[in-house]
Amino acid sequence: MIIIDGIIFSLQKSGGISVYFYELLKYIQKANKEYLHLLYNNQNAYANGNGFIINSKTRLHISIERFRRVPIIGDETDIFHSSYYRLPERSFSGKIITTVHDFTEEMYPRGIVSKIHHIQKRNAILGSDGIICISKNTMMDMHRLIPESIDIPTTVIYNGVGDFKSKECLGEYEPYVIFVGARNGYKNFNMCISALKKINDIRLVVVGGGGFTDNELKLLNTLIPGRYSHAGFITEIELNKLYQNSLALIYPSSYEGFGIPVIEAMKSGCPVIASNSSSVQEISNNAALLIDSICDKKIADAIQSLRNPAFRQEKIKLGIMNATNYSWDKMANETLSFYNTIRGL
């Protein structure tokens, strides 16, 4: 039996790791595999209201529960897979799998919070029988930052994306670019704003990442007043439509473990402008406009280049083709195969 420790659904209301484990659980259920999903008190958008959830009651606050070893239910459990760097109780005799998503906390440390995160991640990795990394870049980061992990069986299994579709009239667009996700420092959101100051007929649509901060509003109102909007939390269908009609996705992040918006945009027929760094280069396979030493002028130049119909069509077609390499079913199927490899089957 497989145990999926669903602690991530209590740590996130939404987010990429939640989606990952939601899709994995959905596939396991569809494949009629015997499993148990341990779910703690949560308000997660993906976990609630789905038939495959089995609740596990705890009296501990989630801030303590997240660091605790997990009691194992059932004598026939042979695979334990935590959604966020936890280990089972020491008496567990089966195989332990850990998925490593990124090393953002190590690359951009935030004091004691990042130190605690790294200790837990390191312990989970070194206590595992098999490691799944969501990109080759993440695997290389793991081997560099935790050298002892080199001896642990490791596979790269890429993330998938949702059911995004391109529209029939490829190449047509409305005069806006889209920025998706978190906007903290290394995401280079301010650079995106500065780039649009150089192009006075293009709007900026921001999706997710929480409301604008006071500093962001000040910069937006100074550099591109009246040319920005925040879509907030929207459905996948609404996001798909925003991608379809956008001139481009701007994704200037300096570091990613994968970069799901890149593939979402490509699958939707939306060209991608991104920093030539970390995993984005790996997953885009030359279908994105990748920028070395990214800056506002280079972003602005890339946006302008996509006004050329032939060049835009080329990038859209390359992106759609590249996106076919990534699906949640493929991710989940490869994960179950890796379970069997670690079992020795």
Model-derived features: positions:
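Carbohydrate transferase catalytic cores enriched for Leloir-type hexosyltransferases
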Residues: M1-L345
